[in-house]
């Protein structure tokens, strides 16, 4: 039973949030325990935020997913997780994620909040607009980079910003 909730929040997609550690790694400060701890907390908290967005996206795609050969097995589309449970879980993940991040750094909070706003707009409006949707998804990866930068105080170089965006465009 618990497995369906783990599938709902897409823990397997949390790997995308490893980008948060990039500023720490590229600055050669990965062994700094305090910065590593802050990055780890922001990674977990940001993962809560991304999970809340995945739930919203699954809700928005519900009818389409039910008719899709493989997506029909997703927890919401299959009915294995009630919509009310998923909605409640999304709200809790969002509040907890933003709450923890707000305790780390106000800048990290605002960067994370911008991610939430952009991704909610994506789910509600932009996901059906070709090229715009890809640009927004790629921007989400750059925002992850800024989460790592703001929580550690390590500035991102222009090359890592550009390369992250281009790589995200490529894999999207």
Please provide the spans of the model-predicted regions.
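Generic alpha-helical transmembrane segments of integral inner-membrane proteins
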Residues: 18-22, 40, 44-51, 88-99, ...
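Transmembrane alpha-helical segments that form the membrane-embedded catalytic/substrate-channel core
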Residues: 47-59, 117-125, 146, 164-172
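C-terminal membrane-associated helical module and adjoining short loops/tails
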Residues: 2-6, 11-13, 124, 142, ...
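Membrane-interfacial segments
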Residues: 60-64, 108, 125, 130, ...
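Helix-coil boundary and interhelical linker segments in multi-pass alpha-helical membrane proteins
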Residues: 25-44, 98-110, 145-163
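Cytoplasmic-side transmembrane-helix entry/capping segments in multi-pass membrane proteins
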Residues: 130-140
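Topogenic membrane-insertion module of multi-pass membrane proteins
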Residues: 1-66, 80-88, 92
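Multi-pass membrane catalytic core of lipid/isoprenoid biosynthesis enzymes
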Residues: 62, 67-112, 158-169
């Amino acid at each position: 039973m618990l497995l369906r909730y783990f599938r709902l929040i897409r823990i397997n997609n949390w790997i995308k949030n490893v980008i948060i550690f990039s500023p720490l790694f590229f600055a050669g400060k990965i062994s700094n325990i305090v910065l590593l701890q802050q990055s780890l907390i922001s990674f977990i908290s940001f993962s809560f935020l991304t999970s809340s967005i995945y739930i919203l996206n699954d809700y928005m795609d519900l009818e389409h997913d039910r008719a899709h050969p493989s997506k029909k097995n997703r927890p919401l589309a299959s009915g294995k997780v009630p919509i009310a449970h998923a909605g409640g879980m999304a709200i809790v993940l969002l509040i907890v994620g933003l709450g923890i991040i707000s305790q780390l750094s106000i800048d990290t909070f605002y960067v994370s909040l911008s991610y939430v706003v952009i991704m909610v707009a994506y789910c509600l409006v932009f996901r059906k607009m070709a090229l715009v949707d890809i640009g927004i998804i790629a921007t989400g990866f750059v925002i992850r980079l800024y989460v790592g930068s703001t929580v550690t105080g390590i500035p991102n170089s222009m090359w890592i910003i550009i390369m992250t965006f281009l790589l995200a465009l490529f894999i999207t």
